[in-house]
A protein has these predicted regions:
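Bacterial N-terminal signal peptides that target proteins for export
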Residues: 1-12
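Extracytoplasmic/surface-exposed domains of secreted proteins
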Residues: 52-79, 124-153, 185-208, 225-233, ...
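Short, surface-exposed alpha-helix to beta-strand junction/turn motifs within ectodomains of secreted
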Residues: 30-33, 63-111, 193-228, 316-350
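Low-complexity, Pro/Ser/Thr- and charge-rich linker/hinge segments at domain boundaries
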Residues: 32, 159-163, 279-300, 404-443
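Acidic, glycine-anchored loop motifs typical of Ca2+
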Residues: 528-532, 536
Length: 879
């Protein structure tokens, strides 16, 4: 191979052979480069060599140890039974045929190279156990072994399909593309080959507009991890970086301007030039952030314009004349700044004609902080209000001198699409069942944890997560460990941990009762379609199936399931050796299940499933009585309400709703604080949490509820909503959050703090609740500082690398419907802080603290209970 043989020749080019044009010019029209980067850094190609060999080419995200191991690979075929997925076929042997440095880092990167792998290209050959058939497809899938993964890039590919060309590899490693930011600023996107030292010299840059040179006045940079080469568990990983470099070239671009950027070999390995023709109707700018799925016709519609330039103007940049000064001196120079509030247009994509013209509203200066302790957006921000555009259609936002947004819909069905994708994500988390590739859009998975659950005496109150279950098993009459006939539920997160989540069922059942007309049988991709039960209820029942199996004859219910430890993130299901154990019975989960079982009973009765309804109600009543008779012992301060009175209040009101027996209503009133203290909050941190009970009470038919008590609880929930609204009311990017909750583990991406507003809106029609639900969904679906949709499959520019075992398949990446945790305020581990530029500081640019790669677990791992809450919110907004 001739390294860099496809780089263009230009004024700054080295004397290398020239072949086809570099694809970087074409990349200017790609909505999201992340999938291409994963292809370049992971499996690039798979080729058949005879009938028993597959040659696999790997990019720079490749572990030298793992890629040579037989146990790290699988070979699968959709049409050759000998290589069926369920057989988990391994190669007989793996041989490394070649490994060479494909791109050499520029000089002056000694410090960066300490954490960066070489930019290598490797070929391994997999020798197969049986011959491949002539007319069948075969895929190589890279897993991992011995605590190393083969790659963090693309993990699977069919032979002869979608191979990466050398010019694409050069573009992804080097200068990927150039785009408009606005007001004379350009964004140059670089891959791992970029040298900060080389980029900090103006002499190494050549920028032209319409063939005329433009000086680079100032430069800023944001750098973070693009892809890992994981070895071991946690710690510091070798990593491949991505760099957003912002150039100030002075004058604002006009339609038709042809922009070209070239750099010397001192700036980057790989591709060194890129160009584009500026047109506000065609050039997507990352400065404009909107909901990528769309907006309801009669709902508020907001988008934003703003862009943080990182270190701009970087003091290390030599040779520039200095950044152009903005007329508005109150604005931060480190982000996009307009002399006056910019105009914008909402454009019908089909006709190309504007349907609205407006002026953006200035809402925030990047010189300010959203709170006393933290800066979140870190940029100047303008808000675009186009709420008066109501005609259904597909639109985009256009701003002179900046560019356009990604397209979005205005339609009454936008949340139905979001709902179905999120429902698919929850289905993909099912445990104890084989997943049908016809339903998952191609992901096949055998049934897991279907052999029953081993009973233990471990109390969950003493071990909130893992416990030494294998040392505390319950033996049956035969003296052997007692295995309960329990299966079902949903996996906790991205691996095969069977940690049970009753709250999935609680969210889905509540969603159905809040808006029953929005749900039907046959609506979602679930195997129970056609059984006469709405699909959202079927999904909830799959969760309850597990808890039914955990109920003893005396009515008590074990406190859930857990494994000995987290499974390996690159293990296939059949290799999971962490076990499936049940906690001891306790009052908390007995009461919680009583409430959920009672709710399922009344829903199933309305669906004409009398026998199933009767069984659930009997189980609910027995669980409730057991919980009352067996309060959890050994509780510490503050735990009594968590384990006894709080869940009992929830169970009591749900049983009252189902049975109409006043004794349960009396129990609820005796337990809840509102009879004696009408000002009591729904929950108080560390003291009590009556959220489940309060929501259940509002679901009561009016003739069953105590009118005064219901109004009191409703007011308490509105007070909680107003508190969550205050969490970002003064922020430029608005979404519901607890003002005391840091941006961590989903706070900046999930809908968890929107659940209260969802109940209130569905039951009262409150317009303010609806507006904040919509704005929270906007944040999830792209209207955030990063311009990312946090859910795979919803939008054109989304997260691509959630930590999820569906990435180990022939498609080479995760399924749709998975929601990432999002920004992590303290940049938890995984080399994030060590590699970030500008250097990480507590409380700065918090909403930018995100890496889109599987191994940044606190940022990228989906969790099923949170996805169920998102489904609930989408459901309330649908139809």
């Amino acid at each position: 191979m001739k390294t860099n043989s496809l780089l263009r020749r230009g004024a700054f080019a080295a004397a290398v052979l020239v072949a086809a044009p570099l694809v970087a010019a074409d990349l200017s029209e790609v909505a999201d480069l992340k999938p291409l980067a994963m292809k370049v850094y992971g499996i690039r190609s798979v080729e058949r060599k005879g009938d028993k060999t597959l040659a696999v080419t790997l990019g720079a995200s490749s572990s030298a140890g793992a890629r040579r191991l037989v146990n790290a690979w699988r070979v699968t075929s959709p049409d050759d039974p000998a290589y069926a997925y369920s057989k988990f076929v391994k190669p007989d042997s793996v041989a490394e045929v070649s490994s060479e440095v494909e791109f050499k880092y520029p000089d002056g990167m000694a410090e960066q190279k300490k954490v960066m792998p070489s930019l290598s290209r490797t070929v391994v050959e997999l020798k197969l156990p049986t011959p491949m058939k002539k007319n069948c497809q075969y895929a190589a899938v890279a897993y991992g072994a011995e605590m190393e993964v083969v790659t963090s890039g693309r993990t699977g590919l069919y032979a002869g399909e979608d191979a990466v060309a050398a010019d694409l590899a050069a573009a992804i490693v080097g200068l990927r593309r150039v785009s408009s930011v606005g007001e004379g600023k350009l964004l140059c996107e670089f891959g791992a080959g970029y040298s900060p030292a080389g980029g900090n010299s103006a002499a190494n840059w050549k920028v032209t507009v319409n063939g005329k040179p433009r000086p680079v006045l100032a430069l800023g940079r944001r750098s973070k991890i693009d892809c890992y080469v994981p070895k071991g568990w946690g710690g510091t990983y070798p990593c491949l970086m991505q760099h957003d470099v912002f150039l100030d070239i002075g004058d604002t671009l006009k339609k038709g301007d042809k922009v070209s950027v070239e750099v010397t070999a001192a700036v980057t390995a790989g591709a060194r030039d890129a160009s584009f023709a500026f047109d506000e109707s065609k050039c997507v700018s990352r400065s404009i952030q909107a909901n990528q799925v769309g907006y309801l016709p009669d709902a508020p519609k907001f988008a934003y314009v703003g862009c943080w330039f990182g270190s701009f103007p970087d003091a290390k940049f030599a040779g520039g004349a200095g950044a152009r000064k903005c007329a508005n001196t109150k604005l931060a120079v480190s982000s996009l700044a307009f002399d006056a509030n910019p105009s914008f247009e909402i454009v019908d994509e089909k006709s190309g004609k504007p349907v609205k013209k407006g002026t953006a509203k200035f809402v925030f200066s990047g010189n300010e902080k959203e709170s006393k302790k933290a800066s979140y957006a870190a940029s100047n921000v303008w808000e675009l209000d186009f709420s008066d555009v109501r005609t259904p259609g597909r639109y985009f936002i256009r701003i002179p001198g900046v560019g356009r947004s990604l397209a979005f819909h205005i339609d009454k069905a936008v949340y139905e699409k979001a709902l179905k994708v999120q429902a698919l994500g929850v289905y993909e988390q099912r445990c104890g069942i084989a997943l049908d590739p016809k339903l998952t859009r191609g992901w096949e998975r055998i049934a897991c944890h279907a052999g029953g659950v081993t009973a233990s005496t471990c109390a969950r109150v003493k071990n909130p997560e893992f416990a030494p279950f294998d040392k505390h098993v319950v033996n049956g009459a035969d003296g052997k460990p007692l295995v309960l006939a329990a299966s079902g539920g949903h996996h906790d997160a991205g691996d095969y941990n069977p940690r049970s989540h009753l709250d999935v069922a609680q969210a889905l059942l509540n969603c159905y009762e809040l808006k029953p007309d929005a749900f039907a049988d046959g609506q979602f991709a679930v195997p129970e379609r056609g059984n006469g039960i709405p699909d959202i209820v079927d999904e909830a029942l799959w969760q309850l199936k597990l808890w039914k199996g955990l109920q003893d004859e005396d009515g008590g219910i074990r406190a859930g399931t857990e494994s000995l430890r987290d499974p390996g993130f690159f293990q296939t299901v059949e290799l999971d050796d962490t076990g499936d154990y049940a906690w001891a019975k306790d009052s908390k989960m007995s009461f919680q299940c009583a409430g959920a079982f009672a709710q399922a009973a009344r829903i199933l009765k309305k669906c004409g499933k009398a026998a199933e309804a009767k069984d659930f109600l009997s189980r609910a009543q027995r669980a409730y009585e057991w919980g009352k008779a067996n309060p959890t012992p050994g509780l510490k301060d503050g735990q009594d309400k968590e384990y006894n009175s709080d869940p009992r209040a929830y169970a009591a009101v749900s049983l009252y709703h189902t049975t109409r027996d006043a004794k349960y209503h009396d129990d609820f009133k005796a337990i809840s604080p509102w009879a004696s203290n009408p000002k009591a909050e729904v929950s108080s941190w560390g003291k009590y949490d009556l959220s489940l009970a309060a929501r259940q009470y509002l679901l009561l038919p009016k003739e069953l509820a105590d009118a005064t008590l219901r109004k009191t609880i409703e007011e308490a929930m509105f007070a909680e909503f107003r508190m969550f609204k205050s969490g970002s009311a003064k922020w430029p990017y608005k979404f519901l959050r607890n003002p005391w909750a840091p941006i961590t583990w989903g706070t900046g991406a999930y809908e968890n703090y929107a659940v209260t507003a969802a109940h209130l809106y569905a039951l009262t029609g409150d317009k303010e609740c609806r507006e904040w639900l919509v704005r929270t969904c906007d944040n999830t679906l792209g209207a955030n500082p990063l311009g990312l949709s946090w859910i795979t499959g919803l939008g054109e520019r989304t997260i691509r690398c959630p930590l999820h075992n569906s990435r180990y398949r022939a498609a080479g990446g995760p399924v749709i419907g998975l929601q990432a945790q999002g920004p992590m305020q303290r940049g938890h581990g995984y080399s994030f802080k060590e590699t970030l530029y500008p250097a990480w500081k507590e409380g700065e640019a918090v909403l930018h603290a995100f890496i889109d790669n599987h191994w940044a677990i606190a940022m990228d791992e989906p969790t099923v209970n949170n996805m169920a809450n998102t489904l609930l919110v989408f459901g309330v907004l649908s139809k």
